[in-house]
């Protein structure tokens, strides 16, 4: 029971050490990834992993829950206070399970759901035909304007009036602009639909007051706690009090059994951190870094190579890069940046002619670098590295670019001393 991981399972310990090295020595720019504080790691690796706690605080189906009840209540209270919401359920194991619970609470199978098309930046759980949401519900989609790549609210209204959905989803996985939540709410009211906002990507910006909050406009709001919020990989549901009972029942027993109390403790820690000025500063640097990146990727040298920025810029933490006119496809560009030590993900762009495993775009995000401490100068440097690589393709001096990346990574050490604590047990 007391032997450290390195002694019990050196294979896994070795792989964890290698992954730690990868995170330290490269630049993480996948928009949905971040680095959690050590306090979050400690909470998630705590003895709460041993405790079963089906039900809600004060109404458990197991004994011995006197302490985990307090933990969950703290997490719920912090979530409500941070986002000024009437109620919160902190039990979803993931964003996808939170979304499944929302649909379970608001709809019955076969009813109509309207969301942003996956090909235009929507999420799998917003009605993609191979996902549970596309199999259980009658799904319609709105998209982006083919020229501006912006969501046209008049077109959304027209689609809603034609389709008459039970629920309208406002949210995205790869859309670089702020949504008009008031307009979505007005459309939902007009057609008698419920409005559900999935703010998984931009919740941290909302918490810091840098992005409009959907909470005053939506019936229900779901989010992940990682991404911009910088907490453990998990989900969270907020909303109006009138939906609390149906949401709670949809989570348990509708979607899950026992909650992961060690993860809920980690959520509580992350939500406390999200109310601090240090967190707000991090979000400001996240946002400014994305704008620096978008501006550099709109430069003449990049444009000459056929690379452009979808919608011409960004309002959030990510930039969507269009490679349709470039010699690179999404897979090739992802591999090229990986070779110089920058991790991104290939991503479809609107009207993408290539298959989803290849794509014609990249999704590039700034949260993890802001968490490491990057400011304007560093974001300008990494933006120039990416621009130079994409403009030059395989003809770029990749070794020189890799050296620049390595220097940036080593200037901002990550998880110093973590090996001794997490792997060796000292």
Curated annotation (Swiss-Prot):
<feature type="binding site">
    <location>
        <begin position="122"/>
        <end position="124"/>
    </location>
    <ligand>
        <name>(6S)-5,6,7,8-tetrahydrofolate</name>
    </ligand>
</feature>
<feature type="site" description="Plays an important role in substrate specificity">
    <location>
        <position position="226"/>
    </location>
</feature>
<comment type="similarity">
    <text>Belongs to the SHMT family.</text>
</comment>
<comment type="subunit">
    <text>Homodimer.</text>
</comment>
<dbReference type="GO" id="GO:0030170">
    <property type="term" value="F:pyridoxal phosphate binding"/>
</dbReference>
<dbReference type="InterPro" id="IPR001085">
    <property type="entry name" value="Ser_HO-MeTrfase"/>
</dbReference>
<dbReference type="GO" id="GO:0035999">
    <property type="term" value="P:tetrahydrofolate interconversion"/>
</dbReference>
<dbReference type="InterPro" id="IPR049943">
    <property type="entry name" value="Ser_HO-MeTrfase-like"/>
</dbReference>
<dbReference type="InterPro" id="IPR015424">
    <property type="entry name" value="PyrdxlP-dep_Trfase"/>
</dbReference>
<feature type="modified residue" description="N6-(pyridoxal phosphate)lysine">
    <location>
        <position position="227"/>
    </location>
</feature>
<comment type="pathway">
    <text>Amino-acid biosynthesis; glycine biosynthesis; glycine from L-serine: step 1/1.</text>
</comment>
<dbReference type="InterPro" id="IPR015422">
    <property type="entry name" value="PyrdxlP-dep_Trfase_small"/>
</dbReference>
<dbReference type="GO" id="GO:0019264">
    <property type="term" value="P:glycine biosynthetic process from serine"/>
</dbReference>
<dbReference type="InterPro" id="IPR039429">
    <property type="entry name" value="SHMT-like_dom"/>
</dbReference>
<dbReference type="Pfam" id="PF00464">
    <property type="entry name" value="SHMT"/>
</dbReference>
<dbReference type="InterPro" id="IPR015421">
    <property type="entry name" value="PyrdxlP-dep_Trfase_major"/>
</dbReference>
<keyword id="KW-0963">Cytoplasm</keyword>
<keyword id="KW-0554">One-carbon metabolism</keyword>
<dbReference type="InterPro" id="IPR019798">
    <property type="entry name" value="Ser_HO-MeTrfase_PLP_BS"/>
</dbReference>
<keyword id="KW-0028">Amino-acid biosynthesis</keyword>
<comment type="function">
    <text>Catalyzes the reversible interconversion of serine and glycine with tetrahydrofolate (THF) serving as the one-carbon carrier. This reaction serves as the major source of one-carbon groups required for the biosynthesis of purines, thymidylate, methionine, and other important biomolecules. Also exhibits THF-independent aldolase activity toward beta-hydroxyamino acids, producing glycine and aldehydes, via a retro-aldol mechanism.</text>
</comment>
<keyword id="KW-0808">Transferase</keyword>
<dbReference type="GO" id="GO:0005829">
    <property type="term" value="C:cytosol"/>
</dbReference>
<comment type="pathway">
    <text>One-carbon metabolism; tetrahydrofolate interconversion.</text>
</comment>
<feature type="binding site">
    <location>
        <position position="118"/>
    </location>
    <ligand>
        <name>(6S)-5,6,7,8-tetrahydrofolate</name>
    </ligand>
</feature>
<dbReference type="GO" id="GO:0004372">
    <property type="term" value="F:glycine hydroxymethyltransferase activity"/>
</dbReference>
<keyword id="KW-0663">Pyridoxal phosphate</keyword>
<protein>
    <recommendedName>
        <fullName>Serine hydroxymethyltransferase</fullName>
        <ecNumber>2.1.2.1</ecNumber>
    </recommendedName>
</protein>
């Amino acid at each position: 029971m007391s032997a450290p991981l390195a002694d019990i399972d050196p294979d896994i310990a070795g792989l964890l050490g290698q992954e730690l090295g990868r995170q330290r020595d490269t630049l993480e720019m996948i928009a949905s990834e971040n680095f959690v504080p050590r306090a979050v790691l400690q909470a998630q690796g705590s003895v709460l992993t041993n405790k079963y706690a089906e039900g809600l605080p004060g109404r458990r189906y197991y004994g011995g829950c006197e302490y985990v009840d307090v933990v969950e209540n703290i997490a719920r209270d912090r979530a409500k206070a941070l986002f000024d919401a009437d109620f919160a359920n902190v039990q979803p194991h993931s964003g996808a399970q939170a979304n499944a619970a929302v649909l379970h609470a608001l709809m019955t199978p076969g009813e109509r759901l309207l969301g942003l098309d996956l090909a235009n930046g929507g999420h799998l759980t917003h009605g993609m035909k191979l996902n549970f949401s596309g199999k259980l519900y009658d799904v319609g989609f709105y998209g982006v304007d083919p020229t501006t790549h912006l969501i046209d609210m008049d077109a959304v209204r027209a689609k809603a009036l034609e389709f008459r959905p039970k629920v309208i989803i406002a949210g995205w996985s790869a859309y670089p602009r702020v949504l008009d939540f008031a307009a979505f709410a007005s459309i939902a009211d007009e057609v008698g639909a419920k409005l559900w906002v999935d703010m998984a990507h931009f919740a941290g910006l909302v918490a810091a007051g840098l992005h409009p909050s959907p909470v005053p406009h939506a019936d229900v709001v779901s989010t992940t706690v990682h991404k911009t919020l910088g907490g453990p990989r998990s989900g969270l549901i907020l909303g109006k009090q009138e939906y609390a009972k149906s949401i709670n029942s949809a989570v348990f027993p509708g979607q899950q059994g026992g909650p992961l109390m060690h993860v809920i403790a980690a959520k509580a820690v992350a939500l406390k951190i999200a109310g601090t000025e240090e967190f707000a500063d991090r979000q400001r640097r996240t946002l400014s870094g994305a704008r620096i990146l978008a501006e550099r990727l709109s430069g003449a040298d990049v444009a000459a190579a056929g690379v452009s920025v979808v919608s011409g810029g960004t309002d959030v933490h990510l930039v969507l890069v269009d490679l349709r006119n470039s010699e690179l496809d999404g897979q090739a560009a992802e591999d090229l940046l990986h070779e110089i030590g920058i991790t991104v993900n290939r991503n479809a762009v609107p009207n993408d002619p290539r298959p989803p495993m290849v794509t014609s775009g990249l999704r590039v995000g700034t949260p993890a670098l802001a968490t490491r401490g990057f400011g304007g100068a560093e974001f300008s440097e990494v933006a120039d590295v990416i621009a130079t690589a994409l403009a030059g393709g395989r003809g770029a001096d990749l070794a020189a670019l890799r050296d620049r990346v390595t220097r940036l990574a080593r200037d901002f050490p990550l998880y110093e001393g973590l090996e001794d604590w997490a792997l060796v047990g000292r």
